[in-house]
Amino acid sequence: MVGGGGKRRTAGAGPQCEKTVEVKKSKFSEADVSSDLRKEVENLYKLSLPEDFYHFWKFCEELDPEKPADALATSLGLRLVGPYDILAGKHKMKKKPTGLNCNLHWRFYYDPPEFQTIIIGDNKTQYHMGYFRDSPDELPVYVGTNEAKKNCIIIQNGDNVFAAIKLFLMKKLKEVTDRKKISILKNIDEKLTEAARKLGYSLEQRTVKMRQRDKKVVTKTFHGAGLVVPVDKNDVGYRELPETDADLKRICKAVVDAASDEERLKAFAPIQEMMTFVQFANDECDYGMGLELGMDLFCYGSHYFHKVAGQLLPLAYNLLKRDLFAKIIEDHLASRSEENIDQLAG
């Protein structure tokens, strides 16, 4: 069958006005962060940051005026990084002569271009939180968490940093038995909850905005965070892969486990076939198919798929006019690393 995989009929299919998220900014009072500093962060990352990003920085400044980025280090084991490093001025203290590449700064092994790390936790599991946005010209749709040493799964944790920290704190409170530690955590929880209430941020794990996005998700992908691509009223924009997720994982496993190059080439045949289907799909403006296959291969994690992912993903992102994501994935695949992801270290 030409095109491979049927078209998906989704309830949310229809012309998509993806700019609605911008409304959020006017809802809250602006955080007291200078426009120069805001411009510096957003110019370095080439991404707009939501107001909760700046509000949370001010909240941490109140907890620890000297080192806001470490305000939650002792109590929660969390540190503010990534774009927060720019607010802290860390990039100006950089010793390395090479320039800071924000596309790779705190980009963990499984982080897709849609994910922007803002907080790190336990180094053993590489726990981290980040903003997840469907397109580089939009504000984030939620805060996700991932443990890169375990897998590629991204878990949704509210639509702002306050909610993500609150959920982390609640989990921590269930684990801690020491009275003194419980008291410290409860104190932070009270301050956090009050700050979020004053500013009007929801502390829910799944908000109405997030549920609305769910209706636009065309496929979950291996990372589970879902992909959103424009699908018009004629259902043009996405078509399903001819293989289920389980089958695709089996195909990937066969490639990785192959005993010889010859076997590996044979095991690669179904992927080659799917790439042909993607070409048909791209010709018919179903750009989501190539994005899904490329993302799944990236998420599987093996270097055997880097070349194919490097062909599929930049093309898909460019066709979707998400050019920054194309650049991020190119940079990431060129130096994909499990360690040394702090661009400001040393």
UniProtKB/Swiss-Prot annotation:
Active-site annotation: 284 (proton donor)
Entry-annotated residues carrying PolyADP-ribosyl glutamic acid: 240
Keyword Methyltransferase: no
Subcellular localization, as worded in the UniProt entry: Chromosome; Nucleus
GO MF terms, alphabetically ordered: chromatin binding; histone binding; protein ADP-ribosyltransferase-substrate adaptor activity
InterPro entries found in the cross-reference section: HPF1
PTM annotation (ADP-ribosyltyrosine): residues: 238
Record-level GO cellular component terms: chromatin; nucleus; site of DNA damage
Quaternary state and interactors: Interacts with PARP1 (via the PARP catalytic domain). Interacts with PARP2 (via the PARP catalytic domain). Interacts with core nucleosomes in a PARP1- and PARP2-dependent manner.
Protein's UniProt name: Histone PARylation factor 1
Gene behind the chain: Hpf1
